[in-house]
Amino acid sequence: MAATATACPAPPPPRSLYRGVALAAPGRRRAGYGASSSAARRWPGCRRRWAAHRIRTVSCAYSPRGAKTITACSWNEYVICSDIPVLIEFWASWCGPCRMVHRIVDEIAQEYAGRIKCYKLDTDDYPQVATSYSIERIPTVLLFKDGEKTHSITGTLPKAVYVRAIEKSISDSEQ
């Protein structure tokens, strides 16, 4: 009398594994673990375990904990009525140089947390705000202090240019 072993299928990997990860291209198989292999027929959970091992993480180009996105409705609350200097990046989703400025603004938001507020505004979604501040080219970064525009920087420039303007704005507000 032969004992038959029934293997319980392995539970699927938790959904948290799939956040920010990329799976390998379909159609590629590893010997012994394909759908038609005898191992897959005998132990159905085997394939799932193998797929979980194939998951690779994707490194993020920049940290998502940077500048927050604002809207035209929240403009007065976050920019005009702010008691500390505010940096606003005007950008558009189709603009390549804007992505480079995103990284700089995100770094500045983390480095100057508490001393300056950093926000992003999509000019395609809110053109009325862009036209009211004469934004004709993007990326454009504006610095506000006490509700008034103090600096305007247009184009993709080194981080030192933005930091210099911020330091000047912060030193003016402390005096």
Swiss-Prot record:
InterPro entries documented for this protein: Thioredoxin (IPR005746), Thioredoxin-like_sf (IPR036249), Thioredoxin_CS (IPR017937), Thioredoxin_domain (IPR013766)
Origin species: Oryza sativa subsp. japonica
Protein name as annotated: Thioredoxin M3, chloroplastic
Family: Belongs to the thioredoxin family. Plant M-type subfamily.
Single GO cellular component term: chloroplast
Site feature Contributes to redox potential value, where: 96-97
Superkingdom: Eukaryota
Alphabetized UniProt keyword annotations: Chloroplast, Disulfide bond, Electron transport, Plastid, Redox-active center, Transit peptide, Transport
Disulfide linkage: 95-98
Primary localization: plastid
Residue positions of the active site: 95 (nucleophile), 98 (nucleophile)
A GO molecular-function descriptor: protein-disulfide reductase activity
Chain segment of the transit peptide: 1-59
Subcellular localization(s) per the UniProt record: Plastid, Chloroplast
Lineage: Eukaryota, Viridiplantae, Streptophyta, Embryophyta, Tracheophyta
Domain Thioredoxin: 61-171
Function: Probable thiol-disulfide oxidoreductase that may be involved in the redox regulation of chloroplastic enzymes.
UniProt keyword annotation of Transit peptide present: yes
